[in-house]
């Protein structure tokens, strides 16, 4: 009916124009009449015309009318309805790989698989943390240190709320002036990332008279803008590399972190560095190769086997999220969001994957258990506001292998990209990123399992089957 009404209005309008032309002067514009110059506009009897080219001629065409009503129509595309997997999975407990890495056996302070290790930040709860600006007589700070940190604190808190699905939150205690640390800043000069307990002890002692450290679980130091004393970063954590608790009048500080000059260069930032280091306070592992932090060895994938697809692989991105496996082992991926199957029982299965950062119901990760220490994980990715925009960071599916015999900082998660993919450059100040996201129609096969992305809309629809 809407189409008929619109046609009737246009028909009546055409008749009105036709009859009106009988009394128009010769120079007046008439629909279909000749005009002199393309683009010329003229109004006659409240109807606007524009001169357009029609074949070899130039003619007047109605542009708009002050009296004619315009009817617009829109097409509403219904949201894609979520559909459950076509086969029933195994118990999600079957996908709780038990860690068997040399690193865990030797140190026992960070985990890459089950059971999780506690002792520092709990997997749920609210954590009080402090931002403490610090300067020295020979390295004075600017007038308003919080001006460059307030948005960073919010991004930090929002990120943890997203990846934990609200299970953890942070309360920030801030001091709006620089705390003057005695002596020279050069005493604490640090060229590479690592512990800096002497600096932290001196800074917290200087801050103690001004700041109430009651209940503070971690301190994030903010050095002066533009400083070059701390080139990369300085951090230490309970049970890892903190030599001893740092005393205050209200209780000991067990974790600290300081973002150095490296993070002053955009698009790097403070908040993603704080997130990465806070991940270690939750006892989560580095997914990068820690023995190759400065590119000492040329590698096919420079950062490590998970490239730039996890905050615990590279806080600079491009993808600044947390993989479904790390969410699973810490308790941030609900069991109902996981499809688990043992390889022996795997039949061809179609699964709709809900993008991993969504807060809606649906399977977010499909895991196929290959052995007691190995799993293939499949998850849906979407670019997010936390990310650094890059060609490799796009909508699609990520497939990777988890090896529970490989520990913290040794590459426990390995991407499985489609055949022929390589490294892609980016504007995130990171090395080339492995082009690992599956597009629609792409498939990968590993460890006897084939994963194919068959559709991508609100959800990513995949097919998983035994190879061959």
State where each predicted segment sits.
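Secreted, propeptide-processed cysteine-rich mini-domains
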Residues: 28-42
